[in-house]
């Protein structure tokens, strides 16, 4: 029996864009790694046998992007997922890092 495990898409492992593309910044210091584009992340995940990729809206499209930028980014990401056979089993909204949400936004009494 081998001690190594070689995952395949059948194992259904998924990874978040925010984990793979994390630049290494924290409250104690600035980023320490270069940015990785979402399409590069998709290619890398496919290479290691991942099933899919998860994301928050702003992991893919930065806050403040124009409609044209958004459409290009989404089209490129969708094409990369199709080209590499990755699913997107979870996409959600970031309701925690933008300052507008500092008081809970939707539940804030202010």
Segments predicted by a language model, with ranges:
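N-terminal pre-domain/capping segments
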Residues: 1-110
């Amino acid at each position: 029996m081998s001690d190594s495990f070689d995952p395949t898409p059948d194992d259904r492992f998924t990874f978040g864009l925010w984990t793979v593309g994390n630049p290494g910044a924290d409250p104690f210091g600035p980023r320490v790694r270069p940015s990785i584009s979402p399409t590069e992340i998709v290619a890398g995940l496919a290479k290691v046998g991942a099933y899919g990729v998860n994301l928050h809206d702003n992991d893919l499209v930065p806050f403040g992007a124009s409609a044209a930028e958004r459409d290009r980014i989404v089209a490129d990401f969708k094409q990369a997922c199709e080209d590499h056979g990755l699913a997107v089993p979870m996409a959600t909204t970031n309701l925690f890092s933008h300052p507008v949400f500092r008081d809970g936004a939707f539940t804030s009494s202010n």
